[in-house]
Amino acid sequence: MKDIKKDPFDEYIRNLPPTRKELGQAWSTAIGLQDVDGLKPSEYLYETAKKSIDGEITIDEAGALINSYYEDKEGRSDSEERTEEADKVSARIAKLLSDKAFIFSPMQYISIHRELFAGIYSHAGEIRDYNITKKEWVLDGDSVSYGSAINLRDTLDYDFSQERNFKYDGLSLDETIHHLAVFISRLWQIHVFCEGNTRTTAVFFIKYLRMLGFDAENDSFAENSWYFRNALVRANYTNIQKGIYETTDFLEKFLRNLLLNVKYTLHNREMHISGKFLSVQDDPINDPINDPIKLEGREKQILDILYENPSITRVEMAKRIGCSESTVKRTLQKLMDKGAIKRIGSNKKGEWIIVYKK
């Protein structure tokens, strides 16, 4: 006899796969996060991601295909090894972001690092046992003061206990965002691991924000992951002699875009402590949103439509605007050439991702 108290849909719900939109967002974020270490995934990774988004393969099968792809490659150069890291870690991040399971704990944080970098770093999931410094572009070659190796675990446990006991009730959204910026910047500053700290912190933070009830599913991490890292750096750096003080202002701008769908344009050059990159002409960052994109009338029309409906077809766009489908196709290509939009998924089932910010 069946248990009438048991929810007949319980098993189905528990095993419900992520939606195409969620998969697309997970892959986009996963790929974008490789920028924090200057890594670029291969074309094979993009092809595999598209198959996953289109439902041709599962997220687990995508990871297996990536692993198999590199098993057959021997004698790789340094650049090829970096591409392999980008591909494998992208697939693993996409899987973690597609999984709703999460516990707010130091062990979860460490586990994420292990899952992302197992077989890539020999120290995956291990707390570092030596002190580190890192020259930062945004600090004009200076370094943040990272956590001391002798008490990393104690520091990590302390930060988690402080956040676990923090009460968000009664806070305004601005106060909440400020607190979240302080928490995540302090967690990142510990730099528990030898490598891979920013990507681990980003994945953990996204899952924590979801646990708090936030929708962290827009393109902020996908398009501005290096800005996120530089903002973390500026939140942890003070040089009184130079008149530079730690600030979460940049990180809070990023979080407002992420959590409140605000449309701040995020410029890495604005964070450089020297101020020498504030003019567009001196901007060294090869970033499609660093410099203004000039759009023509038809391009603006199509962009407005894509903001409303990223899944709209060319035929539907042509009807909306009152032009031919071939005109829409040419305009979309111009927008892609200018770096204003990009396409994820197949022609039939894909979606447009807006890079240009109004």
How would you label these PLM feature ranges?
Residues M1-K358:
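FIC/Doc superfamily catalytic core
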